[in-house]
Amino acid sequence: MTRVKRGNVARKRRNKILKLAKGFRGSHSTLFRTANQQVMKALRSAYRDRKKKKRDFRRLWITRINAAARQHGLSYSQLIGNLKKADIQLNRKMLAQLAVLDPASFGKVAELAIQAKG
């Protein structure tokens, strides 16, 4: 069996990790072992936080909608429930943007929800 020399492969693998670790502080960007650990940790955190970002934004939208709804005498759950009854299909992101950027339009939506209540 012939001998396999893997110097190039090993160097490329290590350089790939060190390239990903660029910008880390201290030995985390220069020494392969510590850089490898930090890159793995960073990739895990990035994956986890991409999922978490969706939850965080939904919480933010709900908080904004709730604050705007209470100015019109409704709670968040009443507003959402009444919008479903009135068959108004605005998602939470759009409602939150209306509440922040165009409060008058949000007021009209809230009025429609109040009418659907009774």
UniProtKB/Swiss-Prot annotation:
GO biological process, one term: ribosomal large subunit assembly
An MF annotation (GO) of this entry: structural constituent of ribosome
Pfam families: Ribosomal_L20
Transmembrane segments: none
Keywords: Ribonucleoprotein, Ribosomal protein, RNA-binding, rRNA-binding
InterPro entries from the UniProt entry: Ribosomal_bL20 (IPR005813), RIBOSOMAL_L20_CS (IPR049946), Ribosomal_protein_bL20_C (IPR035566)
A GO cellular component annotation in the UniProt record: ribosome
HAMAP family: Ribosomal_bL20 (MF_00382)
Function: Binds directly to 23S ribosomal RNA and is necessary for the in vitro assembly process of the 50S ribosomal subunit. It is not involved in the protein synthesizing functions of that subunit.
Family per record: Belongs to the bacterial ribosomal protein bL20 family.
Protein name as it appears in the record: Large ribosomal subunit protein bL20
